[in-house]
């Protein structure tokens, strides 16, 4: 069965897609990262105010509500929220959304195929950097893809209690990851730069993937700090002890990583371990900490 199933794009849609291929992704992303770290005083505050107004950012829920309290754009973008701004569902069987944003797609993995958008599919193997053992664990499992827009809170949290087993940095493209491009660029999430985090949980393995994008200057985790930059040209794998004093245990709702400018989070679950909440569907806005699945194993 073919992995491609695309609608015929219009002329202007083809132009938009072509621009993504021609766009100098890495230089622009590096420039954006540099600019976001500059301390320009009133200029920085003015830019933050314009950005917050343009994207309707809710600063009332942030610890710092005044744009003048941020010294850099990145500090604003990584703003922590007030305590209890995102209550975590405490039901032991609840699996919670890892980030604010919007659901791009969710559902069952068909053998090794995941839905990208409207008939676009990609495989576990390509997404997981050809780690066949990891891919095998999630065949016929469940997945959810969450898109973080520029307005959203950009720290990423744990959907359940887990212990870190492996992290893989995968170099790649930096295509934008909005819904339009997800419908028109084949294998988008499997082509973009990403950080794959594999965890052990009470119901088996779980993967949480932080996918990079245009102007996503860096991806970080709480245990390793900033993963990129610098950007390796090779896949880099890190393995962790899951027992003993050096093991990294994280609780449901704990922060695990962050983006500096928006992108996408993908979660994978093994077959017959979780049941997705029936009312969730593509396009639904999400709040970190809300239940999106129930543990059934």
UniProtKB/Swiss-Prot annotation:
Functional summary from the UniProt entry: Catalyzes the formation of phosphatidylethanolamine (PtdEtn) from phosphatidylserine (PtdSer).
Keywords: Cell membrane, Decarboxylase, Lipid biosynthesis, Lipid metabolism, Lyase, Membrane, Phospholipid biosynthesis, Phospholipid metabolism, Pyruvate, Zymogen
Active site: 100 (charge relay system), 157 (charge relay system), 263 (charge relay system), 263 (schiff-base intermediate with substrate)
A Gene Ontology term for the protein's cellular component: plasma membrane
Membrane topology: Peripheral membrane protein
Catalytic activity: a 1,2-diacyl-sn-glycero-3-phospho-L-serine + H(+) = a 1,2-diacyl-sn-glycero-3-phosphoethanolamine + CO2
PTM comment, free text: Is synthesized initially as an inactive proenzyme. Formation of the active enzyme involves a self-maturation process in which the active site pyruvoyl group is generated from an internal serine residue via an autocatalytic post-translational modification. Two non-identical subunits are generated from the proenzyme in this reaction, and the pyruvate is formed at the N-terminus of the alpha chain, which is derived from the carboxyl end of the proenzyme.
Highest taxon of source: Bacteria
Cofactor: pyruvate
Any matching Pfam family: PS_Dcarbxylase
Annotated cofactor note: Binds 1 pyruvoyl group covalently per subunit.
Family listed: Belongs to the phosphatidylserine decarboxylase family. PSD-B subfamily. Prokaryotic type I sub-subfamily.
Subcellular location: Cell membrane
Keyword Cytoplasm found: no
GO biological process: phosphatidylethanolamine biosynthetic process
Gene transcribed to yield this protein: psd
GO molecular function terms noted in the UniProt entry: phosphatidylserine decarboxylase activity
Record bears the keyword Cell membrane: yes
PTM annotation (Pyruvic acid (Ser)): residues: 263
E.C. code: 4.1.1.65
Class of the enzyme per the UniProt entry, highest EC level: lyase
Metabolic or biological pathway, per its Swiss-Prot or TrEMBL entry: Phospholipid metabolism; phosphatidylethanolamine biosynthesis; phosphatidylethanolamine from CDP-diacylglycerol: step 2/2
Descriptive protein name: Phosphatidylserine decarboxylase proenzyme
Signal peptide: none
InterPro entries per record: PS_Dcarbxylase, PSD-B, PSD_type1_pro
